[in-house]
Amino acid sequence: MNTFDKGTVIRTVLLLIALINQTMLMLGKSPLDIQEEQVNQLADALYSAGSIAFTIGTTLAAWFKNNYVTEKGKKQRDLLRDNNLTK
């Protein structure tokens, strides 16, 4: 028996869902009873969540890069101090 990788299975399932959705639309059936306001609220919520996640991620990355928080970083700081290379 052939085994399929995870990506192939996911793409196939999504293709089937898209085909079923398109067929239902062609037959005049609404596959999902969603109001436009609900879509707008979801888009706003996703934008806000993405914005918060991006801000937190970039803040933590900048903090980590600009501070000597690891053992290696502390050794680098001490070496810079010993050679008078810090401000």
Swiss-Prot record:
Keywords: Membrane, Transmembrane, Transmembrane helix. Belongs to the SPP1 holin family. It comes from Bacillus subtilis (strain 168). Its main location: membrane. It is found in: Membrane. This is Holin. The chain crosses the membrane at residues 45-64. The lineage of its organism: Bacteria, Bacillati, Bacillota, Bacilli, Bacillales. Involved in cell lysis upon induction of PbsX. One of its GO terms (cellular component) is membrane. It is a single-pass membrane protein. NCBIfam families: holin_SPP1.
